[in-house]
C-alpha cells in the first residue's frame, strides 16, 4: 500500500500547515493532509485527490518537493511526504477527518504530533531538506 502526505509552506509567512486529526487511530494528533493512493492512481493524482477531500481544494502551488519516502520493514507500506510551496496561507475547508488546522512557524511543532510525522521531522536528512527549502523560498516579509 502507498500513501502520501502534503506539508504546505507559505512563502509570505514562512509557516507550515498542520491538521488536527479526528480518527480512531490517532485522535487529537496533528498531522498533514493526505492518505492512501488508490489503485491506478499516481502519487500526484492521489495527493491532489486527498487535498480536494480534506482541504476542499488543491491550492495553486509554486513547487512540489519530495521530502521523504518511508518504507515499512516488510516493504508492504510506503509513505511519501512532500513539501508544497504556496504563495500565501489559505483557509482549508475541512472534512470529517479533521477537527481544526493551524499554520505554525518552522520548528514550532504542534502537540501531540502524529507519530509518523514526528519520526519524519526528526530525521537529520529531512531537517537538512527543510532548511534548504526555507533558504530557497525565504519569507518575503
Residue ranges and their predicted role:
Residues 31-32:
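A short gly/proline-enriched turn/hairpin at secondary-structure junctions
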Residues 20-21:
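C-terminal lobe/hinge of AMP-binding adenylation domains
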Residues 35-126, 140:
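Unchanged
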Residues 135-141:
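Short intrinsically disordered terminal tails
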Residues 1-17:
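Conserved N-terminal beta-strand and adjoining loop/helix that marks the start
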Residues 25-28:
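A conserved beta-turn-beta hairpin within the catalytic core of GNAT-like acetyltransferases
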Amino acid at each position: 500500500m502507498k500513501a502520501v502526505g502534503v506539508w504546505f509552506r507559505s512563502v509570505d509567512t514562512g509557516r507550515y500547515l498542520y491538521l488536527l486529526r479526528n480518527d480512531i487511530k490517532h485522535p487529537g494528533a496533528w498531522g498533514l493532509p493526505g492518505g492512501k493512493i488508490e489503485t491506478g492512481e499516481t502519487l500526484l493524482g492521489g495527493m491532489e485527490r486527498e487535498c480536494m477531500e480534506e482541504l476542499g481544494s488543491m491550492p495553486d502551488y509554486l513547487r512540489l518537493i519530495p521530502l521523504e519516502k518511508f518504507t515499512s520493514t516488510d516493504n508492504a507500506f510506503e509513505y511519501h511526504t512532500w513539501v508544497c510551496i504556496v504563495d500565501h496561507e489559505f483557509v482549508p475547508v475541512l472534512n470529517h477527518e479533521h477537527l481544526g488546522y493551524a499554520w505554525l512557524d518552522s520548528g514550532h511543532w504542534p502537540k501531540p504530533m502524529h507519530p509518523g510525522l514526528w519520526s519524519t521531522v526528526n530525521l537529520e536528512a529531512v531537517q537538512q531538506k527543510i532548511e534548504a527549502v526555507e533558504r530557497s523560498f525565504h519569507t518575503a516579509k
